[in-house]
Amino acid sequence: GVANVVSALHQLLADFQVYYTNLRGFHWNIKGHGFFVLHEKFESMYDDAAEKVDEIAERILMLGGVPENKFSEYLKVAKIKEVSDVACGSDAVSNILETYGYLIGEERKIIELANEAGDDVTADLMTGYLKEQEKMVWMLVAFSTKGCTDK
């Protein structure tokens, strides 16, 4: 029921908080050829992640739960791990693609749980996230394709 949805949203909230912090680190520490493009892209991505953190926490409240707000608690349950010392754009993009793979899987599970609970709003929220993330995966894969040169 709804309790399962809330539990899954708690997990997603913790994961998004760690993902957000990783994106900040990528934004601050990126170096090299792709700096200008990636520095801006990572900023827009962490802004988007921050918005999703807020939406997820508010959804937990709407469903009668209480969202966690301590980072120490997020780190205890998050499946996404903190990343440090990433200055190379390709390493950052690889980490983001791996993270998206995980988040997309979790959001699909939440859609199933929400549908079982008759919670159309949460299912719709997650569907919106999937739509954005699948497009971002496509763009990041295209960006990181090796061997493409301008002629």
Give residue ranges: language-model regions.
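Disorder-to-helix initiation segments
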Residues: 1-12, 89-92
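Acidic/histidine-rich alpha-helical segments that form the ligand environment
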Residues: 54, 58, 72-128
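Charged, amphipathic alpha-helical segments and their flanking helix caps
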Residues: 36, 43-54, 113-130, 134-139
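Conserved alpha-helical segments that form or flank metal/cofactor-binding pockets of metalloenzymes
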Residues: 34-72
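Generic C-terminal helix-cap and adjacent flexible tail
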Residues: 145-151
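Helix-loop segments that flank and shape redox-cofactor active sites
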Residues: 1-4, 19-44, 106-121
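A structural signal for well-ordered alpha-helices, especially hydrophobic packing surfaces
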Residues: 13, 20, 27, 46, ...
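Hydrophobic stripe of amphipathic alpha-helices that form coiled-coil interfaces
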Residues: 23-26, 30-33, 56, 63, ...
